[in-house]
């Protein structure tokens, strides 16, 4: 694999020159690969792959049919290089990515424009925008339920 990376790097230097190669490295996000090994693996895996599509969030979807193991030949490169998780993949691309369908997300949107009822939003659990469920009796619940099940007897005053 290292030989493939070195060959493609030398080929890119020959085609674009050293300045163009350095510009490509910066634009494609290879500098961000230094602290993030997952991104580096994705970038190396992208060599020889075809870009299948880009979703509305900027995520790029790739496919490599040659010498790649089945089940590992479709992947996503997230738009956010520093903060990413699987919930950033919209529903229309999820089916293609997990081999449920061979239609890409763009094809699914053209086949059925209103396929999914809600607009996709990533999961913000554990972050500032997270929806936090509070039970009925929780003090932070705005509609806190009064759990008093009885009313104490108050004698009537006679005059």
From Swiss-Prot:
InterPro entries, per the entry: NDUFA12
Membrane association type: Peripheral membrane protein
Keyword Membrane: yes
One matching Pfam family: NDUFA12
Main subcellular location of this protein, as a coarse class: mitochondrion
PANTHER family: NADH DEHYDROGENASE [UBIQUINONE] 1 ALPHA SUBCOMPLEX SUBUNIT 12, NADH-UBIQUINONE OXIDOREDUCTASE SUBUNIT B17.2
Subunit and interaction comment: Complex I is composed of at least 49 different subunits.
Protein name: Probable NADH dehydrogenase [ubiquinone] 1 alpha subcomplex subunit 12
Top-level taxonomy: Eukaryota, Viridiplantae, Streptophyta, Embryophyta, Tracheophyta
């Amino acid at each position: 694999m290292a030989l493939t990376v070195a060959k493609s790097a030398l080929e890119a230097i020959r085609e674009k020159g050293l300045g163009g190669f350095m510009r490509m490295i910066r634009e494609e996000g290879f500098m961000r690969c230094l602290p993030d090994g997952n991104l580096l693996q994705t970038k190396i895996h992208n060599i020889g792959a075809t870009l299948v599509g880009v979703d509305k969030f900027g995520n790029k979807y790739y496919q490599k049919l040659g010498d790649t193991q089945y089940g590992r030949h479709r992947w996503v490169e997230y738009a956010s290089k520093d903060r990413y998780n699987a919930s950033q993949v919209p529903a229309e691309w999820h089916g293609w990515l997990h081999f449920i369908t061979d239609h890409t997300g763009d094809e699914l949107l053209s086949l059925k424009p209103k396929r999914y009822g809600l607009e996709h939003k990533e999961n913000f659990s554990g972050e500032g925008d997270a929806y936090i469920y509070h039970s009925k009796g929780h003090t932070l619940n705005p509609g806190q339920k009064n759990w008093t099940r009885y009313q104490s007897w108050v004698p009537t005053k006679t005059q």
